[in-house]
Curated annotation (Swiss-Prot):
Residues 1-20 are annotated as: Disordered. Residues 23-42 bind DNA. Residues 12-66 form the HTH cro/C1-type domain. Keywords: DNA-binding, Transcription, Transcription regulation. Transmembrane segments: none annotated. This is HTH-type transcriptional regulator PuuR. PROSITE patterns: HTH_CROC1 (PS50943). One of its GO terms (molecular function) is DNA-binding transcription factor activity. Pathway: Amine and polyamine degradation; putrescine degradation [regulation]. Residues 111-178 form the Cupin type-2 domain. Disruption phenotype: Cells enhance strongly the transcription of puuE. It comes from the Bacteria. Represses puuA, puuD and puuP.
């Protein structure tokens, strides 16, 4: 990919250009506006996860591929330290992906932290299933037009092919651990 320290917008711009796409064409294919892509690529705003997923789908990349180091170890790691988790979140939502460098993995696990008043943005949709448990605080899961209020100790299981979102409407932090299959991140 590109340099390790490169800002996300700059990396998105490089990827788009490597694929021979104009900003306007990337906007058409992703369903975003040209101005949104321009603003993101200039690193004036940090895109929501759902927005980033739309762009990466056009570029044929998963979130983990986008955020991973370009060089993968020959042997997948067995023990993954906290410092090795891949941060994929933005705008008050931290999503740390447990990734061992195995490109053929079929399961993804994410540690999610939602600051008060934050959300994943517009509804997310990707192939597969997701299960998760609220470890601390509370979260509102919206799926199929229905809001589900979950508190610490409660779990959820959803078909991620149905658009869904998570919102922390409380005054406290919410922490979730979730697993996804297949690995769309």
């Amino acid at each position: 990919m590109s340099d390790e320290g490169l800002a996300p917008g700059k990396r998105l711009s490089e990827i788009r250009q490597q694929q021979g796409l104009s900003q306007r064409r990337a906007a058409e294919l992703s369903g975003l506006t040209h101005s949104a892509i321009s603003t993101i690529e200039q690193d004036k705003v940090s895109p929501a996860i759902s927005t980033l997923q739309k762009l990466l789908k056009v570029y044929g990349l998963s979130l983990s591929e986008f955020f991973s180091e370009p060089e993968k170890p020959d042997e997948p790691q067995v023990v993954i330290n906290q410092d090795d988790l891949i941060e994929m979140g933005s705008q008050g939502v931290s999503m740390k992906l447990v990734h061992n460098g195995n490109p053929n993995r079929t399961l993804a696990m994410i540690f999610e932290t939602y600051q008060p008043g934050t959300t994943t943005g517009e509804r997310i949709k990707h192939q597969g299933e997701e299960i998760g448990t609220v470890l601390e605080g509370e979260i509102v899961l919206t799926i199929n037009g229905q809001d589900y209020h979950l508190v610490a100790g409660q779990s959820y299981a959803i078909n991620t092919g149905i658009p869904h979102s998570f919102s922390n409407t409380s005054a406290g932090i919410c922490r979730i651990i979730s697993a996804h299959t297949p690995t769309t991140f």
